Each structure stands twice: as C-alpha cells, then as structure tokens.
C-alpha cells in the first residue's frame, strides 16, 4: 500500500525544496508535482489556448472534476510504475482536488500538511526561484489570487486542526524535513504548530 503525504500551501513556501532535500537523504520515496503534469497535458491537448481558458473550456465540456481526473490518472500511472512505496504530492490547491485523488486512487494511508510562511519570505523565495522582476505589492495580489483559488479553505482547516496539520516558516532556516519524516515513517505525529506572529 502506498503511503502519501500531500504538501499544500502557497507558491515559494519551500514545499518542493524541502521535499527534494528529504528525498536526497532517504530511499524509496517519490515526489510528484501536479504543476508540470498539468502544463504537459495542456501543451499536448491545446497549446494555442491559455491555461486558464483551456481549463474553463474543459470544465464546460466535461464538468468541474475534469482537471482532477486528468491529474489523478497521471499520478496513478506514475505510482503504479514506480517501486517507491512512499510519495510526496505537491501542487494541489483545493480540498476537492485532494479528496478526488484520494478516492480515485483508493489511497488509504495519507496525511496532509499545510506549509505557510511570512509574505516577505514567500516574496524573497519567489524572486530567487522565478527570476522575475515583480514588486512586493504585485506579489501580494498574486498571492491573494492563489489563496482565493482554494488555499484559504485548506489553511483555515489546518489552523483549526481539521484533518490537516500546519507548519509556519519564519525563515528558510525553518526546516521541516523532520516533520515530513514523521508522516512517512509512521512515527507518532506531534502536532507541532508554529503560529504566525502578529497575525502574519
């Protein structure tokens, strides 16, 4: 049976970097990022249409679960062809998408961790990773749009301790590899909760 950890949270919160660091030190663990999967499917199906318009068109034709189904199908293929028995899944933005994947792939052993950070840290990491010249104000608007896509609901559930755990990073020195390990090795999970100072 595959063990799955869903890492969710805003762009540039450190999910991918920390996962890669953890995987480099541990064997038999895979990481699947839904972002590249979705971009590849978009390129194969309708490259001349923008991602947003393409998704809207698909949902009109096939229903709102179509993107979740496409992503889940690809995740299922990767898992079935990979010898790893533990996976970290990154890129989910909605509870509905996570729930669909869990049900569609019959995932019984799973955990969900919301990784958050200060807006300043997110901005710093975004600039370093994307190499884009964007103002802090524009980035905050970008971040709010991302939260509005479904992350706000996940964050509130995490803060309330409803099925989702929560980890808050004040700096890039806040390493949560130990927390990842606690989920993937079946150790007793301690509800480590780093609450944001001054309400973020």
PLM segments and residue spans:
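ATP-binding Walker
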Residues: 13
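ATP-dependent small-molecule kinase phosphotransfer cores
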Residues: 30-88, 92-100
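Conserved beta-strand scaffold positions in the cores of enzyme catalytic domains, especially
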Residues: 28-31, 112, 163-169
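P-loop (Walker A) phosphate-binding loop of NTP-binding proteins
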Residues: 10
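Small-molecule kinase domains that catalyze NTP-dependent phosphoryl transfer to phosphate-bearing small molecules
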Residues: 127-199
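Walker A/P-loop
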Residues: 16
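Conserved phosphate-donor/acceptor-positioning beta-strand/loop module used by diverse small-molecule
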Residues: 90-91, 107-130
């Amino acid at each position: 049976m595959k063990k799955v950890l869903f890492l969710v949270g805003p762009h540039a919160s450190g999910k991918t970097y920390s996962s890669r660091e953890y995987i480099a030190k541990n064997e038999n663990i895979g990481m699947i990022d839904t972002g590249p999967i979705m971009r590849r499917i978009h390129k194969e199906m309708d490259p001349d249409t923008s991602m947003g318009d393409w998704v809207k068109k698909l949902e009109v034709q096939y229903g709102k679960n179509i993107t979740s189904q496409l992503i889940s199908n690809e995740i299922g293929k990767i898992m079935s062809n990979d010898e790893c028995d533990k996976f970290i899944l990154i890129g989910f933005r909605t509870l509905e998408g996570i729930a669909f994947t869990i049900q569609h792939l019959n995932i019984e052993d799973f955990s969900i961790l919301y990784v958050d950070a200060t807006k300043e840290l997110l901005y710093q990491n975004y600039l370093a990773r994307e190499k884009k010249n964007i103002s802090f104000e524009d980035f905050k608007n970008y971040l709010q749009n991302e939260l509005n896509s479904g992350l706000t609901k996940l964050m509130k559930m995490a803060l309330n301790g409803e099925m989702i755990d929560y980890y808050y990073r004040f700096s890039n020195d806040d390493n949560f590899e130990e927390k990842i390990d606690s989920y993937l090795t079946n150790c007793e999970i301690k509800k480590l909760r780093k609450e944001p100072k001054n309400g973020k």
